[in-house]
């Protein structure tokens, strides 16, 4: 619905408001990736894996890399060694300047900082470059799969860019390539999980945080605001986390 409204209001000021709502909903794929990655969204393993790959692409979370880095994240939450790449204290969670932190909440700012983006990592993997996360998280027998899927992502990106060129319109890029960069509300929700909490502790109550969200945000986020509960009992489906809380 939001996508159709974006098309209808393209070229008007209304597009900007609707597009930000569209991007926020698109960012909800973070929850799809996460829940299906734990294989708790559906009873069927095939359905979980199918939607895991869709959610992964929408988030630019390469599926193999994030399956292994997320496993490490649960086993060693906010750990320095082994390094928890999903709670990266030195780069993202504790910026040296307040202005650098505040700027990540500006819609589209990530497009100006691609050098530190997850998209750059996918490009590196697509070219067969072994990054720090590949060396430390991904088993040797899975590295070729990571490279292969990264190449699929890049190929789809090129198709989207080519479509924009052929149609002489930015719409394909705006609708399918860059929504993640404008989903700033999703950044706020994600930051609540571990930011400012203790590192290198085994007690999830000290390294993880649960918060309250309004019903709409909670629906988009798939109840992942109950994050302490999720880390303590990761096999419980997200829709049961409020009851567990």
Language-model segments: what does each one mean?
Residues 26-45, 66-78, 189-196, 220-238:
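Acidic (Asp/Glu-rich) catalytic motifs at the cytosolic membrane interface
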Residues 203-227, 231-245:
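Long, positively charged, glycine-interspersed low-complexity recognition regions
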Residues 1-24, 57-176, 238-245:
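Non-catalytic, topology-defining segments of multipass membrane proteins
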Residues 38-43, 130-134, 157-160, 213-218:
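Short hydrophobic/aromatic-rich motifs at helix boundaries and adjacent loops
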Residues 7-31, 50, 54-64, 179-183, ...:
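Membrane-embedded alpha-helical segments that form the functional core of polytopic membrane enzymes
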Residues 41-60, 82-98, 202-214:
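Juxtamembrane helix-capping/reentrant segments at transmembrane boundaries
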Residues 53, 187, 243-244:
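Generic recognition of well-ordered alpha-helical segments
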Residues 23-36, 62, 66, 112-118, ...:
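Transmembrane alpha-helical segments that form the membrane-embedded catalytic/substrate-channel core
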